[in-house]
């Protein structure tokens, strides 16, 4: 049984490592293209964001493909961006096209040592291109005009959500050929007023409004021309091939960076940049959403429910990757008015809010193939946090609950190990008796197990059952934005990254060593040497694992030691009195 147990432990380490390698292969960040790399290092480029640049950004209403890049000339960059600030968002809108070209998340600092610098989700400078575009294309759409994308006018150069104000509306206006357009952005207060500053700092889900990171975008079309106006609403996300700035793990693990869409056949369909390099994706869907994913954060366009849209992905001539959709044809008679709208989500992957916004959008929190186990674990962890208010202590409480759930299985395993420890002298005698005759030795061992009523797999099955739970918890701690920059106590200021002083991994190695002392010594000398190396090997691996995961492993080991010691002493005491 000890050999089988050792094989299982080694298998767990190997399987975990292979899963990491496979995840990187499937979902790792793409290498920065040579063209983009040279562009980023070019000197003299402006630091301020620029407009999209060409009308080739605009899809055609019929196919969703790119426009003619050869025929379209660059559009002049607008002189001044429109600044908008709420309690959770700090963004900039380019009047040329009305695109959101900058967006910072005020509640999520880029680094712990710089809490005043928000994490930059959108950017359109020399370092990175990532922005949200929307407009009107088609026969009479202003974004499809040969004159270039419309230059909107705003009554103010900056807008800010005032104290006590729950909604902020920003109107951009434009007129052409007798048609008046208003592009309206609606922003919402992110944090609930009845929550304390401490609760807001803890980012409790109960303190975040469900529309905190939703931006309403609507077009009001007033046709004062003498003919019927016809056009299509489009929305898309454009990003270059740069690396994920939110990926901070030190284990070599890269979470998925790429596009995803909702389709009738798949509520969560990934379309990586490698897929876009090969071919365009096009499909007609009703409702749904299109999104761009990165570690911890997501951006998604959600169209009007019930309408048919043409979803597409493509790669433009500048090496940027685009995912978006084009809506059905709108018709506005002369003298008539029409309003059409959609929603932009730009923020953290808050599963509850994403699910309420659109079905399937919560799946952008990608827990891998064990999602059906990971989601209940996260649900329980989140509810514990709502009571405790600290993610570190919540992980400890979750570990205790998981240990209690597996108590019967663990107890059976430890009882089997205790019996094995009791008969280890007999096992050693069998080995000495049969020497190198492994067949006879195995037969004698099985007879001994049968006589002593020992199940040789009794210590293995509990480990096999708990493997999926461990792997699921790994992805919960790695993928959940709630763990980002979440402190525990003392030196652990961020549970999502490695322990800066490696204290937890060393403690974990110590607990593994104590566990070995409680287990029977393997009869095989080579196996005994391998088992002695396991604490060192695991300690080395866990040096770069997220502190939250190492904390779980340490607490689990401590509870296992206590449980094993209690059961072993109980069995030994019963044997003495028998």
UniProtKB/Swiss-Prot annotation:
User: GO MF terms on file?
Assistant: membrane insertase activity
GO terms of biological process kind: protein insertion into membrane; protein transport
Compositional bias ranges of the Polar residues kind: 37-65
Q: According to its record, how does it sit in the membrane?
A: Multi-pass membrane protein
Q: Which UniProt keywords apply?
A: Cell inner membrane, Cell membrane, Chaperone, Membrane, Protein transport, Transmembrane, Transmembrane helix, Transport
Localisation: Cell inner membrane
Q: Which residues cross the membrane?
A: 3-23, 361-381, 387-407, 457-477, 500-520, 535-555
Q: List, alphabetically, the GO terms of the cellular component aspect.
A: plasma membrane
Entry-linked Pfam families: 60KD_IMP, YidC_periplas
Q: Where is this region: Disordered?
A: 34-71
Subunit details: Interacts with the Sec translocase complex via SecD. Specifically interacts with transmembrane segments of nascent integral membrane proteins during membrane integration.
Q: To which protein family does this belong?
A: Belongs to the OXA1/ALB3/YidC family. Type 1 subfamily.
Q: What does this protein do?
A: Required for the insertion and/or proper folding and/or complex formation of integral membrane proteins into the membrane. Involved in integration of membrane proteins that insert both dependently and independently of the Sec translocase complex, as well as at least some lipoproteins. Aids folding of multispanning membrane proteins.
Q: What is this protein called?
A: Membrane protein insertase YidC
Q: What organism does the UniProt record list as the source?
A: Pseudomonas paraeruginosa (strain DSM 24068 / PA7)
Q: Which gene encodes it?
A: yidC
């Amino acid at each position: 049984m000890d050999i089988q147990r050792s094989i299982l432990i080694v298998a767990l380490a190997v399987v975990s490592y292979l899963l990491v390698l496979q995840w990187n292969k499937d979902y790792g960040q793409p290498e920065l293209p040579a063209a983009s790399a040279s562009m980023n290092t070019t000197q003299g480029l402006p630091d301020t964001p620029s407009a999209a640049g060409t009308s080739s950004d605009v899809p055609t209403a019929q196919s969703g493909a790119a426009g003619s890049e050869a025929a379209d000339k660059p559009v002049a960059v607008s002189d001044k961006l429109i600044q908008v600030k709420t309690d959770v968002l700090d963004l900039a809108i380019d009047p040329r096209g009305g695109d959101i070209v900058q967006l910072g998340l005020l509640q999520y600092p880029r680094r712990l040592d710089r809490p005043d610098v928000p994490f930059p989700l959108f950017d359109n400078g020399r370092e990175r291109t990532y922005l949200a575009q929307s407009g009107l294309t088609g026969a009479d759409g202003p974004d499809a005009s040969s004159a270039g994308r419309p230059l909107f006018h705003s009554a103010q150069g900056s807008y800010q959500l005032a104290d006590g104000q729950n909604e902020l509306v920003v109107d951009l206006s434009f007129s052409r050929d007798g048609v008046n357009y208003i592009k309206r952005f609606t922003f919402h207060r992110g944090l609930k007023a009845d929550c304390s500053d401490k609760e807001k700092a803890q980012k409790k889900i109960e303190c975040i409004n469900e529309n905190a990171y939703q931006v309403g975008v609507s077009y009001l079309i007033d046709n004062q021309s003498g003919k019927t106006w016809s056009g299509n609403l489009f929305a898309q996300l454009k990003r270059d091939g740069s690396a994920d700035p939110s990926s901070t793990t030190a284990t070599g693990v890269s979470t998925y960076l790429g596009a995803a869409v909702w389709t009738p056949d798949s509520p969560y369909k990934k379309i990586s940049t490698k897929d876009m390099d090969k071919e365009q994706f096009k499909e007609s869907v009703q409702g749904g959403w299109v999104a761009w994913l990165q570690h911890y954060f997501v951006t998604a366009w959600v169209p009007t429910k019930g309408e048919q849209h043409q979803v597409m992905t493509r790669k433009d001539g500048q090496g940027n990757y685009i995912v978006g959709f084009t809506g059905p044809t709108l018709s506005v008679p002369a003298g008539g008015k029409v309003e059409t709208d959609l929603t932009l989500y730009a923020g953290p992957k808050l599963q509850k809010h994403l699910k309420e916004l659109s079905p399937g959008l919560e799946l952008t929190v990608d827990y891998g193939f064990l999602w059906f186990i990971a989601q209940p674990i996260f649900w329980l962890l989140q509810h514990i946090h709502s009571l405790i208010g600290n993610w570190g202590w919540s992980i400890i409480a979750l570990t205790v609950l998981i240990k209690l759930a597996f108590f019967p299985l663990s107890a059976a395993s430890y009882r089997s190990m205790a019996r094995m420890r009791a008969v280890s002298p007999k096992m050693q005698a069998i080995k000495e008796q049969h020497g190198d005759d492994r067949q006879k030795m195995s037969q004698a061992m099985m007879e001994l197990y049968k006589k002593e009523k020992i199940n040789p797999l009794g210590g293995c099955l509990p480990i096999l059952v708990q493997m999926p739970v461990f792997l699921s918890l790994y992805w919960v701690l790695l993928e959940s934005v709630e763990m980002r920059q979440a402190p525990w106590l003392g030196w652990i200021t961020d549970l999502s990254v490695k322990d800066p002083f490696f204290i937890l991994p060393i403690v974990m190695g110590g607990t593994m060593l104590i566990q070995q002392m409680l287990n029977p010594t393997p009869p095989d000398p080579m196996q005994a040497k391998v088992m002695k190396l396991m604490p060192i090997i695991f300690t080395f691996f866990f040096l770069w694992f997220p502190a939250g995961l190492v904390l779980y492993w340490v607490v689990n080991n401590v509870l296992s030691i206590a449980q094993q010691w209690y059961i072993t002493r109980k069995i030994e005491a019963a044997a003495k009195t028998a």
